[in-house]
């Protein structure tokens, strides 16, 4: 049979998932006017890619985030791929000590002071795509949830907590901070920029009046996505059958997303 098309899409590759989920409930107090109970769950899951004929990448996130999510046999979906940063060039001696700039002109070497130093992973004396490595995993080690219910007579208070642990997040918002003249700079990035006086504590490269600079997709943009959240608070009062033809009357209120504790910016 012939379709007339020059190419044909086909499915290949597979993903294996293995996991475990545990649930439990504890009745901590059970009195006439007072009850207190907890129920929770925790889930573990691991996935693994297989059956690919070569490495490939998930769709580009946006113009400045290409080839961030690596798909490779033996790795999980959501693996982050990029360069590894190795501090900053603090002085001309550090620039010259790097084989990449050992023969650079004086002007080029001076321009590199205060710039990000990337790890030459394969030690070939230059920074290329071959120096990229796995820099994160968006899959959590585990996710969990906890309900706590406290009742006093007709009044019931319910709390629901949830969270994850061990998952990384690629913070694409940070890729817009180029420390150059083409875009805005956040106050935090500006205050923590490289300067000769702040070299030891710098988190961002020096500012420049140039339109652009070479800032590679690196572990700079990977953050710990673990979080602990009080998702909901429910308060309920049961009036019982205080009105004829109404067997039960309750009034309740709910607050959502009360607070979140996380290191993600």
Predicted feature locations:
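Flexible, surface-exposed loop regions and adjacent strand-edge segments
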Residues: 1-4, 53-63, 174-183, 265
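Flexible, solvent-exposed coil segments and beta strand-coil junctions
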Residues: 1-6, 63, 122-129, 206-219, ...
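Transmembrane beta-barrel architecture of outer-membrane proteins
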Residues: 3-6, 16-20, 42-48, 139-144, ...
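Surface-exposed coil/turn segments at beta-strand junctions on protein surfaces, enriched
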Residues: 15, 29-31, 150, 228, ...
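Extracytoplasmic gating/loop element in the C-terminal half of outer-membrane beta-barrel translocons
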Residues: 164-256
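Membrane-embedded beta-strands that build the outer-membrane beta-barrel scaffold
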Residues: 20-28, 36-44, 144-150, 155-163, ...
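Conserved small-residue
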Residues: 10-16, 20, 27-136, 256, ...
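Flexible loop/turn segments at secondary-structure boundaries
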Residues: 45-49, 158, 165-169, 259-262
């Amino acid at each position: 049979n012939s379709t007339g098309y020059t190419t044909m899409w086909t499915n290949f590759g597979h993903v294996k998932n293995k996991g475990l989920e545990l649930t439990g409930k504890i009745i901590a107090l059970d009195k006439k006017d007072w009850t207190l109970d907890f129920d929770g769950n925790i889930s573990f899951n691991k996935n693994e890619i297989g059956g690919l004929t070569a490495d490939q990448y998930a769709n580009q996130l946006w113009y400045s985030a290409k080839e961030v999510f690596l798909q490779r046999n033996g790795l999980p979906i959501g693996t982050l791929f990029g360069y590894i940063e190795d501090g900053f060039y603090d002085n001309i001696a550090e620039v010259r000590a790097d084989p990449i700039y050992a023969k650079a002109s004086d002007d080029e070497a001076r321009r590199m002071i205060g710039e990000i130093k990337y790890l030459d992973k394969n030690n070939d004396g230059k920074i290329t795509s071959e120096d990229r490595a796995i820099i994160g995993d968006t899959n959590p080690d585990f996710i969990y949830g906890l309900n706590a219910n406290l009742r006093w007579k007709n009044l019931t208070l319910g709390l629901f907590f949830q969270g994850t642990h061990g998952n990384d997040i690629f913070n694409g918002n940070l890729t817009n901070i180029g420390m150059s003249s083409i875009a805005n700079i956040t106050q935090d990035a500006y205050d923590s920029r490289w300067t000769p006086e702040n070299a030891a504590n710098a988190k961002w490269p020096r500012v420049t009046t140039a339109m652009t600079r070479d800032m590679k997709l690196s572990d700079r943009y990977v953050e710990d996505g673990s979080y602990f959240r009080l998702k909901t608070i429910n308060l309920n009062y049961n009036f019982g059958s205080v009105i004829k033809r109404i067997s039960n009357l309750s009034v309740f209120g709910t607050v959502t997303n009360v607070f979140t504790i996380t290191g993600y910016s």
